[in-house]
Structures are given as C-alpha cells and as structure tokens.
Amino acid sequence: MKLIRFGEINKEQPGVILSNGKKIDVSNYVTDYDENFFGNDGIQKLGDWLSKNQDSCPEIHDDIRLGSPLSRPSKIVCVGLNYAKHAAESGMDIPEEPVLFFKSTSSIVGPFDQIVIPKGSEKTDWEVELAVVIGKKASYVSEADALQHVAGYVLHNDVSERAFQLEKSGQWVKGKSCDTFAPLGPFIATPDEIKNPNDLNLWLKLNGEIMQDSSTSDFIFNIQEVVSYISQFMTLLPGDVISTGTPFGVGLGLNPPRYLKEGDVVELGIDGLGIARQSCKAYK
C-alpha cells in the first residue's frame, strides 16, 4: 500500500495510491496518518476497508498538492555518517556505533514544496535518504525483531546548513532543523511494497546534474541494526521517523564545495519510493 496526504498546507487529508496509479481520498475512514493510526493496526484495517470500499472513494486529481505522507511525528531521529564514502568526504572517521541526532519536526514539508534557504545561510546542502516510519512501539527490541516495528519507508531530503551544523559550537541539530529542511514523500510504501530496504538505489540531481547515485546496500548499519540500536536509548513511538543517512555526493564534499542557491532545483528518488522535486528560494 502507498499512503499519501493531500491538500493545502496544514489542512492535509489522507489518501492512498492504488496499484493502478489512481490516487483516492480515504478521509471518510481515516482521520490522519499519525501515532493513533499506525499504533492501532491502521494499515491492516485500512486495507480491509479498501477491499470493500475503494470504488466509492473520491479520486484525487494530479493538480492537488501532496503534503508529507504522515502527520507530524513525536520525533525524527537521524543517523549520521552511515555510508563510508560520505564519512570520508565529510572529513570524519567511520563510526563504530550509529551517530544519532534529532531533526525538528517543524522542518517537515511535502515532497514538492519549496526549500527555503535560511536567513544568514551560505552553505545549505542536499542529502537524499531512506527514512523508516515506525509502526509499533519499540523499546529494547532485538535486530531479529526490528522489522516487525516498521510501518513503511519514505523518501527524505535531509536538507542541511553546514555552517550552522559544523562551524558553530554545539550539536548538529541547528543545521538540520530549519523550516522546510525535511521534505518527505511523495508516499509511504508499506513493507510489502519494498522487497529489501537494505538494497535500494537512491539518487539526487541538482539542476539536472547527478550529484548522488548509490545504494542502501552500502549502509554501515542496516535498517535492523539502526532500529534496534535507537530503541536501546529511547522509545520509538508509532509514526516516528528514522532517517538512515546519506551517501557520497553532498555539496560539502565537492572541491570546491557547492551549495544550494535561490532558483536551484533538487530532484531525488529511491527505488519503489517515487521521486520528489524541490525548488529553492531565499528567506525573505
């Protein structure tokens, strides 16, 4: 199943993309894709309901905005330096354990919304990432059981301001949490849609030029390891997002470095998770 949310900003409603590509409105049955939905077996219940009711659901036309495919979660947990070549281009050692940081949930936007380059920014960068949506409360889970706690997978551009992140004292969160810095979507793919999340091609283009082109098979820590590891330190709630890191090819690692500017267009995609596109504008 592919879950979407559509409509005006802060007024999004739940929908589904059917196997034939048709988008339908399921707001007569589902209130939102949130902690309550995921934590109460919402995906299974929605599937059962659709088997009897999908033909009566209104169609969502292509000119309707797609928002983030899930409501604001309790947290976004990110894994840093989870590809060896990206660690090298960042001038950092390959980690022996997952590097974790938070990203503000207020940074979430839709897959085709604009990226706003923050006030005072000169080093806003791109990062294509596979994100995991938690479907069942996870605390002290084993690697063997980790995937049982996953509701689905979603495309994420972990937009990052490198000066805020790396050149000022303190934690990375400052460079990761600006408004519009977490475009998610276009949809959440449930696990049955994704054969192996640890072997997916992912790519990113800047103004049509390929900047990142890799595979999650290059993970240092795979999905099972990451979910289990994080759950040893905090409880993951249904609807929470784990972003699993970016591969080689960010602007920071180029010689000379290259960063986003007003008018730039970023396109990104992951096998089975669709394509997103964001244009950039400066804060005003």
Segments predicted by a language model, with ranges:
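N-terminal non-catalytic cap/leader segment that marks the start of a structured domain
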Residues: 1-98, 267
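Short, structured patches in soluble enzyme cores that scaffold and shape functional sites
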Residues: 5, 103-105, 112, 119, ...
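Catalytic-pocket segment enriched in acidic/His residues
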Residues: 5-10, 47, 51, 58-59, ...
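Structural signature of FAD isoalloxazine-binding scaffolds in flavoprotein oxidoreductases
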Residues: 8, 94-111, 124-126, 261-272
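Generic beta-strand structural signal
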Residues: 74-77, 97-99, 113-115, 122-130, ...
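Short helix-loop capping/hinge motifs at secondary-structure junctions, enriched
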Residues: 138-142, 193-196
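N-terminal accessory regions of nucleic-acid-interacting proteins
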Residues: 139-154
